[in-house]
Amino acid sequence: MNENKNNPWEEIALDEYEAHMSLDSVKQLQAMDSIMKEQFEAYPADTAMVLGVAGGNGLRHVRREKYRTVCGVDINEGYLRKTAERYTGLSGVLECLRIDLINEAEKLPAAKLVIANLLIEYIGYDAFQRAVLQTGAEYVSCVIQINTDESKWVSDSPYLHAFDRLDEVHHQIEETALTAAMAEIGYTGILQKTKPLPNGKALLRLDFKADRNTR
C-alpha cells in the first residue's frame, strides 16, 4: 500500500459495510454475531480485545458479570464512535481504541482473550503475530473467510463499490499458514469450526491457546 494513502478501511462508510454484510446473499454480520456469542463465553477470561471491531457487531453478548474490560480496536475513528454510541450499556467495561495494527501494535493493552474476525486478511500474518504478542493473550479466537473463488473474495452486492480499494491491503489467509504463524509465537490450535454462508463461502473459526512453556 502506498504510504501516502490512508488505509482503505478509513474510507468505507459503516452503513454501507454493514448493509453489505447483512444482505441475504452474504449474511456475514448475522453469522458473526452468533460466532461472537460463543467466542465471548468459550474461555475463562475476564478481559478481552476485539481487533477490527467495526460497528461493534457481537458486543451485545458481552456479560458484565464475566468481563471487567473489553477493548474494541479499529483504525476507523468513525466506527469506534458508533460502537460507543450503540453500547452505552457497557459503560465502564467497553474501551474503544483507534490503533493502526500494522504500524502501532505496541499501543495495544494486555488482554486474556483476543478475538480477530475477518481481520487477519487485512493486516497479514506478521502484523497479527505482533499484535497477539503485545497483548500477552492466553486465548486467541479468529475467524477467516474460505473462498470458493479467490478472485472474488468480496461477495457481489449493490455496495461493492465501497470496497474498491481493499485489494491494496487484502491477504489471502490459509488455515495451515495461520496455524504455523501462531505456532511460531507459542500458540497451539485448540478448536476448528466451520460455518457455511449462503454464497458458497464459509467462515472458519480457529482458536489457539498459549503454550505454558512459552509464557
Q: What label would you give each PLM region?
A:
Residues 1-43:
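Class I SAM-dependent methyltransferase Rossmann-like catalytic core
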Residues 147-169:
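Short, glycine-/aromatic-enriched active-site segment of Class I SAM-dependent methyltransferases
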Residues 166-186:
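Short alpha-helix
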